[in-house]
């Protein structure tokens, strides 16, 4: 479960932990990164210097690659939110997608009824997976924008520093979408159509996008080259 290289460099470890600490000297080395000509107030830095050793928790970001399966084999157990699709904070959308999951799942269970729980749960996942995968990608775009800001260009056009939150993200109604498309999506499951070949359900992701598997290594290479490849479709 890889994580972003800049975070690994701080602790020097790939170990997953809730209790990694970092010293104040390390914080001060990194505190002004990405701020351009601006810097933190010296008084803030003096406060950081006063923090006792081994008391600053380095809450690192661990990533899970997108997985189209969010359920147990019998689709009686399902994960939602970050358990199903982890988000970078830069996406500004992780909590929203978790709420959308809950609304979508509840709607599908109501439509399918207690006699069809596995089908209802599987239909919910199909209605959600590609959308969430695309929203996850937006987090990398925004992280690149925020962490490697070209401040000279921002002075000319401040909008260049504004994180992207396109219409296809905020306009979506997961309850309405589930009720309008449940039966069509459920039928693709009955017919054995792969989720990435469904063409009978309108997209709730960027118009024109064709799903392609991706992982953190792909995105990290793009970030290192300052070009995040979002794939086909209209992402704006």
Which residues are covered by each model-predicted region?
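FAD-dependent flavoprotein oxygenase/oxidase catalytic domain
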Residues: 1-236
